[in-house]
């Protein structure tokens, strides 16, 4: 579909908008005027005419698709394989559990601290499993979001969030 843009005076633009609305009877068009601007909208296009002191400006608005094509994308009618559902359920049950890391890890992106080392004696809480997002299975490198609270000298308690693999932590008593 090709769309052209024409530059015209504000009076001509308003009369052309009403003529376009009358000429295309099969496409419902709506014309509204508010605060020195006229808007012509249809199911196929949306044009906004703005009047200024020197000239009229014609802007083309894009429409957003509300439904995806049924031949592509995620089909909600088909069910996922049972082993994926069991794995998802098993991983979602871990959310809220207290965990410890198995070996020391360095965390670099902590505000106002150069680096923090997580040791096996520190306890964190799993906040989220990110392997299932917006109805689709994804394969993140570090699927578990774990929150730690550490005491830093001269700053008090600092909350930091770390993404970990399942092999990097062990679950302790809930």
From Swiss-Prot:
GO biological process: photosynthesis
Name of the protein described by the UniProt record: Ferredoxin-thioredoxin reductase, variable chain, chloroplastic
UniProt KW Chloroplast keyword: yes
Annotated keywords: Chloroplast, Oxidoreductase, Phosphoprotein, Plastid, Transit peptide
Subcellular location: Plastid, Chloroplast
Primary location group: plastid
Residue numbers bearing the Phosphoserine modification: 70-71
Name of encoding gene: FTRV
């Amino acid at each position: 579909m090709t769309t052209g843009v024409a530059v015209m005076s504000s009076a001509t633009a308003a009369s052309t908008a009403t003529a376009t609305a009358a000429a295309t009877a099969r496409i419902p068009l709506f014309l509204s005027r508010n605060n020195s601007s006229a808007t012509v909208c249809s199911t196929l296009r949306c044009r906004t005419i703005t009047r200024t002191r020197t000239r009229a400006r014609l802007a083309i608005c894009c429409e957003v698709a509300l439904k995806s094509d049924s031949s592509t994308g995620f089909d909600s009618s088909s069910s996922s394989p049972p082993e994926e559902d069991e794995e998802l359920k098993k991983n979602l049950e871990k959310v809220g559990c207290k965990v410890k890391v198995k070996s020391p890890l360095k965390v670099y992106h902590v505000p106002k601290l150069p680096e923090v080392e997580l040791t096996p004696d520190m306890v964190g809480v799993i906040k989220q499993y990110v392997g299932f997002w917006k109805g689709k299975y994804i394969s993140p490198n570090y699927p578990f979001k774990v929150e730690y609270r550490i005491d830093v000298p001269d700053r008090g308690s600092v909350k930091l969030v770390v993404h970990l693999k399942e092999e990097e932590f062990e679950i302790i008593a809930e």
